[in-house]
Regions:
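Conserved GNAT-fold acetyl-CoA-binding loop/helix
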Residues: 47-69
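A short linear boundary/processing microfeature
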Residues: 45-46, 54, 161, 165
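Short amphipathic alpha-helix that is part of the acyltransferase structural core
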Residues: 32-52
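Acyl-donor (CoA/ACP) binding surface of acyl/acetyltransferases
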Residues: 1-36, 81, 86-192
Length: 192
């Protein structure tokens, strides 16, 4: 019975795949094929890969595109990926939630502003705030958390600005990360 209740919640969450969520500076929209080229360019960028603690992709765009198309067809029920788009229609980055846990009432999030001309302009903070508001208003999640590289001061400042607090340092893959979280009671005390 418990698993049916959880699965039912997730099926309801997936009914409206083509949602868009408006922030003050950005719109979070479901990923589409039109976002593939930017995603490829950002995932092959050395600096962006370092900030995401990954290796740059070393495959051809055509190969990437085939995988991308398959990912768009098979959307998961425990995660969702969004394109971050400005109000003038420019795709500047991506964010997502994943590892949605309806038992612990928590999920992890991630973000990347891939277009570097939009760094240090509040687009990342607005994207995070918009995603937080969406999650707390449409799910039963009480805790949203993330891991960011300790040396990535820009990201940490953006997360703090969005209401996250630093919880502890953790080592993952040989790198030091800061675990940060925001709780529903802190983010929206009137929405308990």
């Amino acid at each position: 019975m418990f698993s049916k209740r959880i699965l039912s919640k997730h099926k309801n969450r997936l009914k409206n795949q083509s949602i868009s969520i408006n922030g003050n500076k950005v719109i979070l929209m479901a990923k589409e094929l039109q976002h593939a080229l930017n995603d490829y360019l950002w995932r092959t960028d050395i600096e962006l890969s370092e900030l995401d603690d990954t290796k740059p992709l070393r495959i051809k765009y055509e190969q990437f595109l085939e995988v991308y198309k398959e990912e768009l067809k098979h959307k998961g029920i425990w995660s969702r990926r969004f394109a971050i788009v400005t109000y003038d229609g420019k795709h500047i980055g991506n964010c997502m939630y994943y590892d949605m846990d309806d038992y612990k009432l928590q999920t992890e999030i991630g973000i990347m502003i891939g277009d570097k001309t939009y760094w240090n302009s509040g687009y990342g903070s607005d994207s995070i705030k918009t995603l937080i508001e969406y999650l707390f208003n449409t799910t039963s999640i009480n805790r949203i958390y993330l891991h960011t590289l300790e040396w990535n001061k820009r990201a940490r400042a953006s997360f703090l600005k969005a209401g996250f607090v630093e919880v502890k340092r953790v080592i993952r893959g040989g790198n030091m990360f800061v675990l940060m979280e925001i709780l529903r009671t802190i983010a929206a005390p009137n929405n308990n």
